[in-house]
């Protein structure tokens, strides 16, 4: 089967890390990038140098108005309106929508006008079908032209929640994500009309925040709809986050059996998506980790046979971007 050709709209954190992952995974080929705010020279610079993931280990050049990475020429567009991007001229059948702006079916479907067959939104969506690789991708229907890869936190939480619910049953639960800083935050205190706390300086504060990640699990795993909710604490670290899932179980059990169930899933049906460790790890140990979720067996605690706190790490940039690549490749295979 031919490798699917892909366009990326929005060359920010996720757009750039998706490209790095695509070059490593080799399951998709990026043939075009659109960003109205980044010219070609700056695009090459931003891709080559990364404060979190390090310098790109390969060649980055500009030739004939194209971005050339390791000999692969990528067309560059600078359109503001997705409907104006000529994806077809580059042969891009699939578009990764990573601006964070066009997150509904209506707005993201504008890419279809330029020749794309399908749009994969790298963010949660209010109305597009959401898929978490390793959890519910088998429900994908090729007739769906706009889909969402959900959020990085949902991608961490859903595999863990699925294993626990399938094995022991979840009656209800609360999630907290201790989340690394992202681009929407402020370097120093600044205006943030909708979220006053979110306007405070990212490097100086632990900032309580809202997140729809836990509720979104109910869309991905219908059996958990209405059973989970959660919140976030934004912390002054550049990357890698951690989920704390505290649940009331339907079936009494012990922590060793919980560990065994998660370990079995990590070595079986969820291999590559769900990881497992018993080491004394900290956040930087997971920078660049491909997994969506890495269960920290030695960090969890159990209060009673039906009440337990589980801890799972995730690289909210790298691991999430790898799943975006995986979802594109999966849907493309279903088209053939």
Swiss-Prot record:
**Under which EC number(s) is this enzyme classified?**
1.2.1.12
Q: Which InterPro entries match?
A: GlycerAld/Erythrose_P_DH (IPR020831), GlycerAld_3-P_DH_AS (IPR020830), GlycerAld_3-P_DH_cat (IPR020829), GlycerAld_3-P_DH_NAD(P)-bd (IPR020828), Glyceraldehyde-3-P_DH_1 (IPR006424), NAD(P)-bd_dom_sf (IPR036291)
User: Major location, coarse class?
Assistant: cytoplasm
Query: What Pfam families does this protein's entry cite?
Result: Gp_dh_C, Gp_dh_N
Compartments reported by the entry: Cytoplasm
Cellular component terms (Gene Ontology): cytosol; fungal-type cell wall; Mcs4 RR-MAPKKK complex
**From the UniProt record, which GO molecular function terms apply?**
glyceraldehyde-3-phosphate dehydrogenase (NAD+) (phosphorylating) activity; NAD binding; NADP binding; oxygen sensor activity
Q: Provide the assembly information.
A: Homotetramer.
Q: What is this protein called?
A: Glyceraldehyde-3-phosphate dehydrogenase 1
């Amino acid at each position: 089967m031919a490798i699917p050709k892909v366009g990326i709209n929005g060359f920010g954190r996720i757009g750039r890390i998706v490209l790095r992952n695509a070059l490593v995974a080799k399951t998709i080929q990026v043939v075009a990038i659109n960003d109205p705010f980044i010219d070609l020279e700056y695009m090459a610079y931003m891709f080559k140098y990364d404060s979190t993931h390090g310098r790109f280990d390969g060649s980055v050049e500009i030739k004939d108005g194209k971005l050339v990475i390791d000999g692969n020429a990528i067309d560059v567009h600078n359109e503001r309106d997705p409907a104006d991007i000529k994806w077809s001229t580059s042969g891009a059948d699939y578009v990764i929508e990573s601006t964070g702006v066009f997150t509904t079916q209506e707005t993201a479907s504008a890419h279809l006008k330029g020749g794309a067959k399908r749009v994969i939104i790298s963010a949660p969506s209010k109305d597009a079908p959401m898929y978490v690789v390793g959890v519910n991708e088998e429900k994908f229907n090729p007739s769906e032209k706009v889909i969402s890869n959900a959020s990085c936190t949902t991608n961490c939480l859903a595999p863990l929640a699925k294993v626990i619910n399938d094995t022991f049953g979840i009656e209800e639960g609360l999630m907290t994500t201790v989340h690394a800083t992202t681009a929407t935050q402020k370097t120093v205190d600044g205006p943030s009309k909708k979220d006053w706390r979110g306007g405070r300086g990212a490097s100086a504060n632990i900032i309580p925040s809202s997140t729809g990640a836990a509720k979104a699990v109910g869309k991905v795993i219908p059996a958990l709809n209405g059973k989970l909710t959660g919140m976030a604490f934004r912390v002054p670290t550049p990357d890698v986050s951690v989920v704390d899932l505290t649940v009331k179980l339907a079936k009494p059990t012990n922590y060793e059996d919980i560990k065994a169930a998660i370990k079995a899933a990590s070595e079986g049906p969820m291999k590559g998506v769900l990881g497992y460790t018993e080491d004394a790890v900290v956040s930087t140990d997971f920078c660049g980790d491909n997994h969506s979720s890495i269960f920290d067996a030695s960090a969890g605690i159990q209060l009673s046979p039906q009440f337990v706190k589980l801890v799972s790490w995730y690289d909210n940039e790298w691991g999430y971007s790898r799943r975006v690549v995986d979802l594109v490749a999966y849907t493309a295979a279903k088209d053939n």
